[in-house]
Amino acid sequence: MIVGLGVDIVELARIEKSLTRFGRRFAEKVLSPEEMAAMPTLTVNYIAGRFAVKEAAVKALGTGFSQGIGPTLVETVATSGGKPQLRLHGAALQCARDLGVTSCHVSISHDRSSAVAVVVLEAL
């Protein structure tokens, strides 16, 4: 049964503006250490896609970025085949457990001006 659904669209120009202004500090504020390590350079598409997943995930959880859930507690990791997977930590993980979440589905897409992500949370 679906217990959460979230969608988010991020304008690449907004991320580019933040990177220009704040550089690596911006990326470190919104990406987990593992996401930072997986990023070869500070790329707008990578950061925008990951941020869209984070926003979609907290919408699916029904919390937004509140209740102790910050961007670094929601991360996107790739399987060996490159498929994006959601990994939650801390308050985000506890919220998912409270909802009975047993599986998460993630999709990310980009075009010239935006990144979009969809997150579906399922429970048995």
From Swiss-Prot:
Signal peptide interval: none
GO cellular component, one term: cytoplasm
Main location: cytoplasm
Catalytic activity from the UniProt record: apo-[ACP] + CoA = holo-[ACP] + adenosine 3',5'-bisphosphate + H(+)
Pfam families hit by this protein: ACPS
GO biological process: fatty acid biosynthetic process
Transmembrane intervals: none
Cofactor(s) in the UniProt record: Mg(2+)
Alphabetic keyword roster: Cytoplasm, Fatty acid biosynthesis, Fatty acid metabolism, Lipid biosynthesis, Lipid metabolism, Magnesium, Metal-binding, Transferase
Locations listed in the record: Cytoplasm
Enzyme Commission (EC) number: 2.7.8.7
Top-level enzyme category: transferase
Sites where the protein binds Mg(2+): D8, E55
GO MF term set: holo-[acyl-carrier-protein] synthase activity; magnesium ion binding
Function: Transfers the 4'-phosphopantetheine moiety from coenzyme A to a Ser of acyl-carrier-protein.
Family: Belongs to the P-Pant transferase superfamily. AcpS family.
Protein name according to UniProt: Holo-[acyl-carrier-protein] synthase
Source taxonomy: Bacteria, Pseudomonadati, Thermodesulfobacteriota, Desulfovibrionia, Desulfovibrionales
